[in-house]
C-alpha cells in the first residue's frame, strides 16, 4: 500500500523550464523568470495486477514570464491550471483537466482548455483553442532548432470533441469540430525543407462533419498553387495510419 505526497521545493517558474528536455529548452541557467510554478500531489492506495495508486497531481502557474538573455522578446502572462487525476485506481480512469493554459508574446495571445478522460482506455478529448500569434515572434522568444524559419499570422478559434473508439471505427458522427482558422503570409523553411513553403492566405471553417477550405494560395520553390474545397471526416484523416 502506498501513501505519498509531494510538492516542488520552490515555486520559481524556472522549475517549469527545467522539466522540458534540454533539446527544446536549451541552457536555462541565465533565463530570467518571474512568477511561480508549483507541482503538488498525492498517491495513495494499493498496487496489484488490477490497480494502481489513486492520485491527484496539480500543476499551477500564475502570471509568470521568462526571457532568454540572447533573445529580444519574452513569453509573459503564463497561466497553467492543470490536474492529472485517478480516483479509482483503475489505470483506464486516468484523466487530465487543463482548465487553463495561456501565454503572450508581445500582444499576441494563445489560450487552451481541455478535458482528456479515460487516458489509457477509450481516450475522450474535449478541447478549445483560440489565439492570435505572429509566428515570427516564436524564435524571438524561445530557442528553435537551427535553420528553422517560421513566419506568418495565425488566428484560430476551434473546438473539438471526440473519442478514439469512434475514430478507429470510423464512426465520425460521434465526433464534433467547429470554428475558424486563418493563416496569412505564412512561410516555413528548415534544414529538411530548404525551399520555403509560402502560404499567402489560408482560411478554413470547421463544421461538425466537414472542414471547408475557403481559400488557399501559396508557393513552394517556383511552383504556385491555389485551392478551395471540403474535407470530410477531418479527425479520421488526421488519425489514419
Label each residue range with its predicted role:
Residues 1-97, 101, 108-211, 223-241:
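Membrane-proximal interfacial segments on either side of biological membranes
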Residues 214:
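Acidic/polar loop patches that form or flank catalytic/metal-binding clefts of enzymes
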Amino acid at each position: 500500500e502506498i501513501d505519498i505526497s509531494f510538492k516542488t521545493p520552490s515555486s520559481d517558474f524556472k522549475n517549469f523550464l527545467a522539466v522540458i528536455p534540454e533539446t527544446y529548452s536549451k541552457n536555462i541557467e541565465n533565463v530570467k523568470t518571474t512568477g511561480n510554478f508549483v507541482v503538488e500531489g498525492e498517491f495513495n492506495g494499493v498496487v496489484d495486477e488490477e490497480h494502481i495508486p489513486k492520485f491527484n497531481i496539480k500543476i499551477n502557474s500564475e502570471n509568470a514570464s521568462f526571457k532568454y538573455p540572447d533573445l529580444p522578446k519574452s513569453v509573459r502572462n503564463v497561466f497553467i491550471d492543470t490536474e492529472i487525476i485517478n480516483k479509482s485506481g483503475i489505470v483506464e480512469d486516468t484523466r487530465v483537466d487543463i482548465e487553463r493554459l495561456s501565454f503572450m508574446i508581445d500582444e499576441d495571445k494563445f489560450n487552451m482548455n481541455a478535458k482528456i478522460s479515460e487516458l489509457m482506455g477509450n481516450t475522450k478529448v474535449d478541447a478549445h483553442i483560440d489565439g492570435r500569434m505572429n509566428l515570427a515572434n516564436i524564435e524571438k522568444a524561445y530557442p528553435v532548432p537551427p535553420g528553422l524559419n517560421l513566419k506568418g499570422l495565425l488566428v484560430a478559434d476551434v473546438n473539438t470533441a471526440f473519442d478514439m473508439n469512434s475514430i478507429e471505427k470510423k464512426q465520425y458522427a460521434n465526433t464534433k469540430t467547429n470554428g475558424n482558422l486563418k493563416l496569412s503570409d505564412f512561410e516555413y523553411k528548415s534544414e529538411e525543407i530548404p525551399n520555403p513553403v509560402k502560404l499567402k492566405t489560408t482560411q478554413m471553417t470547421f463544421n461538425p462533419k466537414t472542414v471547408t477550405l475557403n481559400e488557399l494560395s501559396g508557393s513552394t520553390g517556383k511552383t504556385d498553387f491555389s485551392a478551395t474545397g471540403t474535407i470530410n471526416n477531418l479527425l479520421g484523416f488526421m488519425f489514419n495510419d
